[in-house]
Amino acid sequence: MEKIKQPVLVLVGPTAIGKTALSLQLARQFSCEVVSMDSMQVYRHMDIGTAKISKEEQGEVPHHLLDIVEPDEHYDASMYCRDALRTITEIHARGHIPLVTGGTGLYLQSLTKGFFEGPPSDSAVRERLQEELDNLGPEEMHARLEQLDPLSAQRLHPNDSYRVMRALEIFAITGKPWSQLLSQHKPENQFANMLQIGLTCDRPLLYDRINMRTQIMLDAGLEEEVRGLLDMGYSRELRSMGSIGYKHMANFIFGDWEFEEMKTLLARDTRRYAKRQYTWFNKDEDLHWYQKESKAEIVDRVGQWLEDQLSKNL
């Protein structure tokens, strides 16, 4: 596959670090269109719990890959890769710069280095596994994966039935763990000119910001948003509804947790998610890390890089 030669900017970092504000600044200054890289912001009706950018801000700067599927629709990294590549091509055709921003590391990997899909699905195997899932439940299927492919089981939540089932299907078809096949996949960046910037800050500051964001979401009406989703018929068992914030509020609404317990666990699990994001992004050698306070330095770096790209094409 021939590499994409037009410039692409990427801005990543953990949740609550301040990516949205900086992405808007960069987009206004350098004629960018933002391509969301968030596995939860693809869902319609899920705005507060995903910290989705406001409609007003979307009106100021074009944003893409927000609100593209319903909460009960399947959407994964391979689909994101397809949609993001198409969107980036369209932005280049308009003479603008794509600014890919978000915190979903798997989406970045699928976009830059391609997505390892494994062998084609086998309908007979899928039907058998689905029947077993219906009879045994997700916890038992995850436990089975833990025996066959512990590395995949470690990174997959028991409620992520789609990926657990896919990992079991791959083992049934090939006799090899998905994690082993994935480790043998040697991808390279399919973009010839991409600048990847990571935002970071001291952990205590980030955790304070996460605690503040938790309160802001609750004050903004997270409970009403989740009740609305439930009233629309979206089950709390859905993958989208099992995500941080929605799962916690549903547990409160159904009486599983008291309010203060829900609030404490929501902040705690968001902090844990931020740690997992750091773990993922720290493995990416193409990322250039900056302190979140260094906005002027980042703007200068982006400006110089874009000038260099322009001069190369003259």
From Swiss-Prot:
One of its GO terms (molecular function) is ATP binding. Substrate binds at T15, A16, I17, G18, K19, T20. It catalyses: adenosine(37) in tRNA + dimethylallyl diphosphate = N(6)-dimethylallyladenosine(37) in tRNA + diphosphate. Gene3D superfamilies: 1.10.20.140, P-loop containing nucleotide triphosphate hydrolases. ATP binds at G13, P14, T15, A16, I17, G18, K19, T20. Monomer. This is tRNA dimethylallyltransferase.
